[in-house]
């Protein structure tokens, strides 16, 4: 039975993000086979060959817009869903464990998202001032917007209105800066989630030395297991394999630049030699 009070939403602008979203949904359906999924996208594709996409339940919201406008939709999520309880997952996530308890959190809180365990140092995020220029993002505890549980209400509508306004006002490509200010100025009851709810894997995760999280957020850590799954989906949906491979390589280059050539070499070795182990851990075997 479809639960009409709950929904899960993704925003996939660009072909790579569409296949990432569909891979995330593949892992989701091993945990939750019933909750309705919305996919907001600017790619006109046919999911007919995706066996875990239920056309009678799930819904694609197609907007022929530029890919760089994706955050305009993210900061206005509440406009696209009627369900009472909602979770937004970034496309580059894998759902590895049950998350049912989070729905009940929304009986007591208006919004739940991960509190970042370290300072935000990234240029364009951490060095931006908020709250009447009183604080820099790097000087204040902050949240990550990759996984957001929220409950529909007038308060949440006001929060999204603020978030969208701050995003436009800041005129930067990151939505996280506006997220901070809108959260702090809102009257929402905010539940900070722990790291397992939105986990960024390091080399120890791929070595199998880290407990499996609830939600894995791999960003540019696109292993060979993940890459092969993405390419399978690209073939099923008849999307542009060349473009998707190029985008994957670009993201990997970003990871290599961040961690250095030696650590990148180690990571690739682990991806190669622990391929089957990783498949099992990611529920993709």
Task: Annotate each PLM feature.
Residues 1-285:
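Glycosyltransferase catalytic domains, chiefly GT-A lineage
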